Each structure stands twice: as structure tokens, then as C-alpha cells.
């Protein structure tokens, strides 16, 4: 297959391989001759499109023609512009159905925590309350790993450094504290050492007071200014924590007990054709078995938000989604930035033309499920089903937000490729087989097989098998590469 018309209403098709000028394309019993070279992932017109008329992809407008576009012409940023404006008015027009029957739930081997949560890793985490102690925390980590043969018997000891925790006010201070508190409670961590300096805004005492119930044998706190030798004190804390969690064992559980974040980064023109629809099918499978998934990257919902709104389970959920979308648009406006200048240079090089084009592909990850809840940044997941989470499109911030909400894994589709990993296993799904072959050390799964003849049901089954392996302890590429990062959303001033 060299090209695809995604929806019956489309007036463009997408090249699935590089197509040369003069290539004859047959679609709907009509033959179109390409008037220019069209790269893989890029679009070409199937019919003449008049100046000002809509360019249709996924059955919906992705922009309008800047000039007359003849059949066979390359359709991209040079001749197409977004239709989108600033704040919009929305109506609740529910349009959803029950999910069809899905394959049976799968057994996985997981860690059961005392509070009822489950984890897919048993790691010892070091969390600085403030960036000033990152170096101290690194020394503590390195010394401890040498003393314990790399924390034998666990899935590792990891430091998640950041630059925040002081000189912050308002929402930024709250976001930093909340993200770190969510990490303390994350079930992939068998134990946590929180390290403060002593004079920062993000005070350890206030952090503990607002943290809620914790197991004091598995969560320790240390303030460096109160220690004679903070390195030795920190190492002693880690030994105590290690001795508590090192004997934790996996137990049988169900895949539907896990929470999955859905994300894309470095998207291309195949993202909405291969990897994202597959993730949508996986999300439906998990949810049909009683599980939980969550979609974020709010700026990459712009242009497709009405589709998600129509899937909200009730008007209250719809209103929460409207507020989330318009609040994020207002965030752009308040900083005097254009709302719809989203597609990156890499997106455009891969064939994505407008934000509508990007968003309609991005939201394929949501599948056909009903939206059960809309969460603010820093909120934790509480309702099984498809959730939406407020966070930006930035890969690092969005991945951290998903993990902070309680996701055990983040499922991350990419067409251009990225090595990035968050603080939970970050499963990279390539939209095209060329990327999967070139970057085997980055990519965990090849969804590009769809355009080379593999049927979606078979691909989905193989993907479920892969996720079960990762849940059972097999390392993702980001884990093997030790690419584990934390990024916290910042929107305000720095003192």
C-alpha cells in the first residue's frame, strides 16, 4: 500500500511511501496523476480544491486552501492554513455508544502495596524538594549503589532531580509540591527518600503535613542543613528503606488494574494512521475490561476538542472539558502567544500541516470510549475509564504529568523518534517501520507494520503481549538506556 484515503469524505490522501511526480494514483475508481513529488506522510489532493474551500482529512476540515489546488498537487503549509480562532463556544452534543466486546483481560505479575495500590516496578526513589540539593542527592545515590551492588534485589535506585522548589509562588509552588507528593505516593516506588535543604519555599514540614497518610517505614525525610554529614545520613536512610522494600515480590494480577498514559511526540503524517489508532484500540480494550487510560496534551486537542466533548459521559464532565480547553487557550493569550502555531518543524517535515491536522491525529489515541473525568494538572486518577488531564504538549512535562496522575506506564507514539523517558516505563511506538529499524535502541514497538499488510487485530494482540512483558518486568528502551526524567509545569514568575 503506497497511499491511503482515511475517510470517505476526504479530498486528500496520504502518501505511505515517497511518491514521485507523475505517479498515477487510483482512489474511488478515479485516477489522479501526481503533479509533484510527495514524501511519505504528506498529503496530495484527490480533487480540485477551490481557494477558500476546506481541506478534508479524517472526514473533517484541517484547514482551508490559500489558493486553488489542483488534483494531484502536494497539500501542505504552502497552500493550506488553519481555520481555527481563539476562544470558542461549545455545545454538549453527546455522541457515543457502548464499546463492542473485547478480548479477555490478561494476567500480569505486579507488586501489591499495603494501601491497595499496585505497581509494575519496585524502585527506590530519591526526591529533592529543591534543586539546591541535586548534587548532594547524586552523591548519596552513587555511594549507596556501590555499597549494595546496585541495590540487588530491586528494580533500581533513581534520583529525579529538578530545578524548582524555591523562588516560586502561587500555582508554580503548588505544582512543584503536588508533583513531588504524587511521586512519593506512586506505587512503582517501593520506598522514597525526600531530601530538603532547609530554607527553601518547599519546606519539608509543610510537604509532610499536606502529603496525607504514608508508611513511615517506606518514606523517609532528611533536611540537609540539620545534618552534620548529610551524605552519610542520606546513605543510612537509603539502607533502612532498602532493607524494607528489597524483599517485595510480584504477585498475579490483571492488566486492567494498571493505569496507562497516552501520549505522542515527534509526530508525523502517519501518526494518525498507524500508532495512534492502535493506541485507541488498546485504550478501548483496557477500558472494556474495567481499566483506566488518560489522554493529555491539551494544546493538541485544539481543533479536535468537539469530538472529545461529544464523548463526555454527562454535561458536568463536558463543562469541565470546556473549562480545561478555554483555560489553556487563555494561558496562550495571557502570554501574547498565538494559539494555533503548534506543529513543530519536525511535525511539518513529517507531513502535518495545521493544528487541526495534528489534533485529529493525536486524539485517535482516545479510541471510542466515553470520557469519564477531566482532571486538573496534579490531580490523581480516581475513575476507571477514559480520563483527560490538563497539561501542555511538551513531551517532558506531559509524560511527567501522566505519571504523576498515577499512570504505571506511558504509551508514547512517535514518527520522528525521541529517546525521552519519564519516571515510569515509557513505551515508544514508532508510526513507521523505517524509524523502528533505524532506532532499535529507542523504539519498543513498530506500529508501521499496519501499512505493510498486518491487520489491526493482529497488531493489537502483539502490542498487548508487549505491554504484558513490560508490566512483568521487562525493561523498556528508556529504562535500559537509563533515560529517566522529571519535568514540572511552570507558568509564573521566578523570584
UniProtKB/Swiss-Prot annotation:
GO molecular function, one term: ferrous iron binding
pH dependence per the entry: Optimum pH is about 7.5. The activity at pH 6.5 and 8.6 is only about 20% of the maximal achievable activity at optimum pH.
Catalytic activity: D-altronate = 2-dehydro-3-deoxy-D-gluconate + H2O
Upper taxonomic lineage: Bacteria, Pseudomonadati, Pseudomonadota, Gammaproteobacteria, Enterobacterales
Induction record: Repressed by LeuO and H-NS. Part of the uxaCA operon.
Protein's job: Catalyzes the dehydration of D-altronate.
Enzyme Commission number, as recorded: 4.2.1.7
Gene: uxaA
Cofactor(s) demanded: Fe(2+); Mn(2+)
Keywords assigned by UniProt, alphabetized: Iron, Lyase, Manganese
Matches recorded under InterPro entries: GD_AH_C (IPR048332), GD_AH_second (IPR007392), SAF (IPR013974), UxaA/GarD_SAF (IPR044144), UxaA_altronate/galactarate_dh (IPR052172)
Recorded metabolic or biological pathway in which this protein acts: Carbohydrate metabolism; pentose and glucuronate interconversion
UniProt name for this protein: Altronate dehydratase
Family, similarity comment: Belongs to the UxaA family.
Free-text activity regulation comment from the record: Is inhibited by high concentrations of Fe(2+) (> 2 mM), and by EDTA or other iron chelators in vitro.
Organism superkingdom: Bacteria
Cofactor note as given: Mn(2+) can substitute for iron, but in higher concentrations. Cannot use Fe(3+), Ni(2+) or Mg(2+).
UniProt-listed GO biological process terms: D-galacturonate catabolic process
Amino acid at each position: 500500500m503506497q497511499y491511503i484515503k482515511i475517510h470517505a469524505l476526504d479530498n486528500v490522501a496520504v502518501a505511505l511511501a515517497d511518491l514521485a511526480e507523475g505517479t498515477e494514483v487510483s482512489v474511488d475508481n478515479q485516477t489522479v496523476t501526481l503533479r509533484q513529488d510527495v514524501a511519505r506522510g504528506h498529503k496530495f489532493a484527490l480533487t480540485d480544491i477551490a481557494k477558500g474551500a476546506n481541506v478534508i482529512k479524517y472526514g473533517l476540515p484541517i484547514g482551508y486552501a490559500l489558493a486553488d489546488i489542483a488534483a494531484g498537487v502536494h497539500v501542505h503549509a504552502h497552500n493550506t492554513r488553519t481555520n481555527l480562532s481563539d476562544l470558542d463556544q461549545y455545545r454538549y452534543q453527546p455522541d457515543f455508544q457502548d464499546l463492542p466486546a473485547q478480548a479477555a483481560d490478561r494476567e500480569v505479575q505486579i507488586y501489591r502495596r499495603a494501601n491497595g495500590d499496585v505497581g509494575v516496578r519496585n524502585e527506590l526513589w530519591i526526591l529533592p524538594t529543591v534543586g539546591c540539593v541535586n548534587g548532594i542527592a547524586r552523591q548519596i545515590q552513587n555511594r549507596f549503589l556501590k555499597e549494595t551492588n546496585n541495590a540487588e534485589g530491586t528494580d533500581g535506585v533513581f534520583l529525579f532531580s529538578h530545578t524548582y522548589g524555591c523562588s516560586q509562588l502561587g500555582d508554580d509552588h503548588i505544582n512543584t509540591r503536588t508533583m513531588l507528593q504524587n511521586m512519593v505516593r506512586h506505587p512503582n516506588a517501593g520506598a522514597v527518600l525526600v531530601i530538603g535543604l532547609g530554607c527553601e519555599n518547599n519546606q519539608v514540614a509543610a510537604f509532610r503535613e499536606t502529603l496525607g497518610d504514608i508508611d513511615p517505614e517506606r518514606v523517609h525525610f532528611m533536611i540537609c542543613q540539620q545534618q552534620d554529614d548529610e551524605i552519610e545520613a542520606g546513605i543510612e536512610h537509603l539502607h533502612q528503606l532498602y532493607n524494607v522494600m528489597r524483599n517485595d515480590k510480584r504477585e498475579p494480577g490483571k492488566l486492567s488494574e494498571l493505569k496507562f498514559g497516552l501520549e505522542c511526540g515527534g509526530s508525523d503524517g502517519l501518526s494518525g494512521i498507524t500508532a495512534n489508532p492502535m493506541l485507541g484500540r488498546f485504550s478501548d480494550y483496557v477500558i472494556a475490561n474495567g481499566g483506566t487510560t488518560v489522554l493529555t496534551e491539551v494544546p493538541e486537542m485544539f481543533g479536535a476538542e468537539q469530538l472529545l466533548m461529544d464523548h463526555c459521559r454527562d454535561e458536568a464532565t463536558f463543562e469541565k472539558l470546556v473549562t480545561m480547553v478555554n483555560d489553556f487557550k487563555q494561558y496562550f493569550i495571557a502570554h501574547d502567544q498565538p494559539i494555533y502555531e503548534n506543529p513543530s518543524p519536525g511535525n511539518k517535515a513529517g507531513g502535518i500541516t495545521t493544528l487541526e491536522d495534528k489534533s485529529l491525529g493525536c486524539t485517535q489515541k482516545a479510541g471510542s470510549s466515553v470520557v469519564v473525568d477531566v482532571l486538573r494538572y496534579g490531580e490523581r486518577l480516581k475513575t476507571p475509564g477514559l480520563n483527560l488531564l490538563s497539561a501542555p504538549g511538551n513531551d517532558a512535562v506531559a509524560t511527567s504529568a501522566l505519571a504523576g496522575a498515577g499512570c504505571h506506564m506511558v504509551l508514547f507514539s512517535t514518527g520522528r523518534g525521541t529517546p525521552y523517558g519519564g519516571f515510569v516505563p515509557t513505551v515508544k511506538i514508532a508510526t513507521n517501520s523505517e524509524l523502528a529499524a533505524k532506532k532499535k535502541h529507542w523504539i519498543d514497538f513498530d506500529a508501521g507494520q499496519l501499512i505493510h499488510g498486518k491487520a489491526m487485530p493482529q497488531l493489537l494482540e502483539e502490542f498487548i503481549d508487549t505491554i504484558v512483558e513490560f508490566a512483568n518486568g521487562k525493561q523498556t528502551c528508556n529504562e535500559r538506556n537509563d533515560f529517566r526524567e522529571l519535568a514540572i509545569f511552570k507558568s509564573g514568575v521566578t523570584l
